[in-house]
């Protein structure tokens, strides 16, 4: 008799994805982030569900309902802060996951990579809408500024913005629809993640060497289940340290002031994980140009596979490529810092230089360095 794990139609899918899955024997801790993202998503859906039980999406009561969750609901404070800081952990894992993909050339799995980019956009949209829900000053003005960017689209821009707002300004209709979208999007993300995995399992995982590992595979369980649990414990420890010791570290103090359309905060800025894109947006003096640069800062990832010129897949044996990759990381950290600074000298210039460098590395320098390395290996 066949094992039920291998014969049952439903259990078989789980078995082939998480138990008997043939995995390369040499994948490092950088391959942990996929499973960590899955855990983050489940954590966000569960904490979000419990928050939604007590939250009211009405401009008059939204701020008070969040305060009520923190003060009066049993363990409401920990649920709220796990959800808020869980989003930060989600993005840390996302950036590490994408960085791993760029470093080790995982982007050559085109379908998996493109679904991943779509996932990144969807998660960013979800996080943005979630930030609007507490209806503090930064929520309101963040929503106003970011949705207003769409007005840069020629001809239909203004109508589009008012259609999204459900009126002539960010108001009750906007908050209600943002809550509805914020609730439904994580389930769409779950479906996309399943498709992401489906495409990944068509080809099998990449590995640090970038060479086919078909000749040396090991079962996912117990080897990588144990390895993933270690990563999970480290992540949960970091998350709970943040939640229990400094829950407001990554938040904005302005969001503890109820939304007031008549008073603009001195410095409008998004959450830390959007600051790099926000800095690129601000570095271009033209509104439409800024919006295009903002979208391109993520969409540029879709062009990365087309610009791969090296004969080697990953950067493990490519010192020039490695230098360029870490320069890109440093540049993104610089952009993140600039995005949180007020608009003024010298931050404007630094932001513009960092933005130029960001696009130059990906679109110009990486393909050139790949070709140079190919030539050097011939000598």
Curated annotation (Swiss-Prot):
Copy out the cofactor comment.
Answer: Binds 2 heme b groups non-covalently.
Biological role: Component of the ubiquinol-cytochrome c reductase complex (complex III or cytochrome b-c1 complex) that is part of the mitochondrial respiratory chain. The b-c1 complex mediates electron transfer from ubiquinol to cytochrome c. Contributes to the generation of a proton gradient across the mitochondrial membrane that is then used for ATP synthesis.
Q: Which cofactor does it need?
A: heme b
Its ancestry begins with: Eukaryota, Metazoa, Chordata, Craniata, Vertebrata
Keywords assigned by UniProt?
A: Electron transport, Heme, Iron, Membrane, Metal-binding, Mitochondrion, Mitochondrion inner membrane, Respiratory chain, Transmembrane, Transmembrane helix, Transport, Ubiquinone
Amino-acid positions noted as binding heme b b562 in the UniProt annotation, renumbered to this chain: 83, 182
Q: Which residues of the sequence carry a binding annotation for heme b b566? A: 97, 196
Q: What else is known?
A: Heme 1 (or BL or b562) is low-potential and absorbs at about 562 nm, and heme 2 (or BH or b566) is high-potential and absorbs at about 566 nm.
- Give any Gene Ontology cellular component: respiratory chain complex III
Keyword flag S-adenosyl-L-methionine: no
Question: Which protein are we looking at?
Answer: Cytochrome b
Family statement drawn from the similarity comment of this UniProt entry: Belongs to the cytochrome b family.
Give me the segments passing through the membrane: 33-53, 77-98, 113-133, 178-198, 226-246, 288-308, 320-340, 347-367
Record's Pfam families? Cytochrom_B_C (PF00032), Cytochrome_B (PF00033)
Subunit-level organization: The cytochrome bc1 complex contains 11 subunits: 3 respiratory subunits (MT-CYB, CYC1 and UQCRFS1), 2 core proteins (UQCRC1 and UQCRC2) and 6 low-molecular weight proteins (UQCRH/QCR6, UQCRB/QCR7, UQCRQ/QCR8, UQCR10/QCR9, UQCR11/QCR10 and a cleavage product of UQCRFS1). This cytochrome bc1 complex then forms a dimer.
Localization, per the record, is:
Mitochondrion inner membrane
């Amino acid at each position: 008799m066949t094992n039920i794990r291998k014969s049952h139609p439903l259990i078989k899918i789980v078995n082939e994805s998480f138990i008997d899955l043939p995995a390369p024997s040499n994948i490092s801790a950088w391959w942990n982030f996929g499973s960590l993202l899955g855990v983050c998503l489940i954590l966000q859906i569960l904490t979000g569900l419990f928050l939604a039980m007590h939250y009211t999406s009405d401009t008059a009561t939204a701020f008070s309902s969040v305060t009520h969750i923190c003060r009066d609901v049993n363990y409401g404070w920990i649920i709220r802060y796990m959800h808020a800081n869980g989003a930060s952990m989600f993005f840390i894992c996302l950036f590490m996951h994408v960085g791993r993909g760029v470093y080790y050339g995982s982007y050559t799995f085109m379908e998996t990579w493109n679904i991943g980019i779509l996932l990144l956009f969807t998660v960013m949209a979800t996080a943005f809408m979630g930030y609007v829900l507490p209806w503090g000053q930064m929520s309101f003005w963040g929503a106003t500024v970011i949705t207003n960017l769409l007005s840069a689209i020629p001809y239909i821009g203004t109508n589009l913005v008012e259609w999204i707002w459900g009126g002539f300004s960010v108001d009750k209709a906007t908050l209600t629809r943002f809550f509805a979208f914020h609730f439904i999007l994580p389930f769409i993300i779950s479906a996309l993640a399943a498709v992401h995995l489906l495409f990944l399992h068509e080809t099998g995982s990449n590995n640090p060497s970038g060479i086919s590992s078909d000749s040396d595979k090991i079962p996912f369980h117990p080897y990588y289940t144990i390895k993933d649990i270690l990563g999970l414990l480290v992540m949960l420890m970091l998350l709970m340290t943040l939640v229990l010791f400094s829950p407001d570290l990554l938040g904005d103090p302005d969001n503890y002031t109820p939304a007031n359309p008549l008073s603009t905060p001195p410095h409008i800025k998004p959450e830390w994980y959007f600051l790099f894109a926000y800095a690129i947006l601000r570095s271009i003096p033209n509104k439409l140009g800024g919006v295009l640069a903002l979208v391109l800062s993520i969409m540029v990832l879709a062009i990365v596979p087309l610009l791969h010129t090296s004969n080697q897949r990953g950067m493990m044996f490519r010192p020039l490529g490695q230098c360029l990759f870490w320069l890109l990381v440093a540049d993104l950290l610089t952009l993140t810092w600039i995005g949180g600074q007020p608009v003024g000298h010298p931050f404007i210039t630094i932001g513009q230089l960092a933005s130029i460098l960001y696009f130059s590395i990906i679109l110009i320098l990486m393909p050139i360095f790949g070709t140079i390395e190919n030539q050097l290996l011939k000598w």
